[in-house]
Regions:
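Structured beta-strand-rich core segments of catalytic domains in phosphoester-bond hydrolases
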Residues: 1-58, 145, 150-155
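Glycine-/small-residue-rich active-site loops that bind phosphorylated ligands and cofactors
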Residues: 15, 69, 99
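Surface-exposed cleft-lining segments at the edges of enzyme active sites
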Residues: 32-39, 64-72
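Metal-dependent phosphoester-hydrolase catalytic domains
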Residues: 51, 72, 76, 85-93, ...
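Charged active-site motifs of nucleotide-sugar-dependent glycosyltransferases
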Residues: 57-60, 91-92
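Generic enzyme active-site microenvironment
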Residues: 63, 95
Length: 173
């Protein structure tokens, strides 16, 4: 692919590993795993972050996948995400499967401290064959450093059970 990658393992699964992956056309460094509240004896949830090596800019990129069948854990995980990153001086982009629709508490909680890339449109991403739910998001902070150029759901149904979101953001100078 010609892309740079980092992988954060969550669990061993069926002879391999399951976790969060980050891909970038820019070099990635300093992979950090931020464990989220939940059920440690099951699939532990996390935010995986990397520094994106951009010329003259400081960007932290993260990915997450919140708990799928426990609303209380999802809300606690959203709060932990904000608590972990709210005081950092870096520009941060966070993408992931929140397993929650826009009106649900985890999304409402994150929007208190983060800007969401696609708040003006309903970008349904799940299930992949006939998307009827918006549960995947791209957030960023602080809001005055990036400008949204575009965002869209890509009609691709092979790589995942979710459709991907493509967003173009640019630095505000």
């Amino acid at each position: 692919t010609g892309m740079h990658a980092q992988f954060a393992r969550q669990i061993d699964f069926e002879g391999g590993q399951y976790g969060q992956a980050l891909l970038s056309r820019w070099p990635l460094a300093d992979l950090v795993i931020h464990w989220l509240p939940g059920e440690p004896e099951r699939e532990r949830r996390m935010v995986a972050t990397c520094s994106v090596q951009l010329p003259g800019k400081q960007l932290l990129f993260g990915t997450t996948h919140l708990h799928h069948n426990n609303a209380d854990f999802r809300l606690r995980q959203a709060r932990a995400i904000t608590d972990s990153f709210v005081d950092l001086p870096a520009t941060i982009i966070l993408a992931g499967d929140l397993n929650a629709e826009p009106q649900h508490p985890p999304v409402v909680e994150l929007i208190k401290s983060w800007s969401v890339v696609h708040s003006a449109t309903n970008l349904r991403t799940f299930p992949v064959d006939k998307p009827s739910k918006q549960i995947d998001y791209i957030f960023y902070r602080p809001s005055d450093r990036l400008r949204i150029v575009s965002s869209e759901v890509i009609a691709e149904a092979v790589a995942s059970d979710h459709r991907p979101i493509l967003a173009v953001l640019e630095w505000v100078e």
